Amino acid sequence: GIIKTGKFSADFNVSFGNNKNEILEMDATVLNMLNTKFTQENRNVLQRVQLNNPFGAIYGFRYKGVYQYNYETFADLTVAEQEQFLASGKTAPVALNANGEIIRNSKGEPKRTKYCFSNSENESKDYDFKGGDAIYEDINNDGNINELDIVYLGSSLPKLTGGFGFTLNYDRWRLNAQFNYRVGNKILNLARLDAESMITNNNQSQAVNYRWRKEGDFTSIPRALSTSGNFANYNTMISDRFVEDGTFLRLNYLQISYNMPQKMVKKI
């Protein structure tokens, strides 16, 4: 729109759009072809397509923090002390059912939470969680963290995208600006994942100074793991720990100009 009054005038523009999609039906064979395999050291972005979710969605584990204590510390407590331990908000790698109750074996011992990997090539690995390890939500409450616990974490598609701008004129002066924006999308911050991994020679984020170091530490940054072994990458699995809001407002350009009088130009 244009506004004019005396020597002043203003011109505004705005645009917006929404791209929404949902996968309602797809041949099972095609679905399997599109979905990448889950690996035991999965730090790669899973390409996954699921019905009733949008194409371009992010999938991974739900991150719930860091285990404060080792399993052995918890297991050595009496049953009453164990219940009090959990009621106080402390965490240890112990399997809980849907009601938050401790899952026990035939001997009455608490079941230890494990990271369990297996695939169609008959490869199988188990890892016993320890104090300082990342806590991933056990979706089906079986005490095993595996591919069945991978869930939808959000869409990379924005709910709204577009731009706006204006041109302001006063006498011979002009101010011109243009912005673009995106609202409601999720991004997977792989730069942050690498900077908090503590398994490479790359520079690390200041956040790793607050990592778990000893039993009882309360922090959101897991312990440092050795780069050797099958589970060196466990604490930086793809999860909502690294999923962030992708909303932004960006200034594309800002111009200030002055239209010199013709007489002045001729003198130059």
Where are these regions (language model features)?
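Residues that define the transmembrane beta-barrel architecture of outer-membrane proteins
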Residues: 8, 158-162, 247-252
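Extracytoplasmic gating/loop element in the C-terminal half of outer-membrane beta-barrel translocons
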Residues: 109-111, 124-133, 137, 182-268
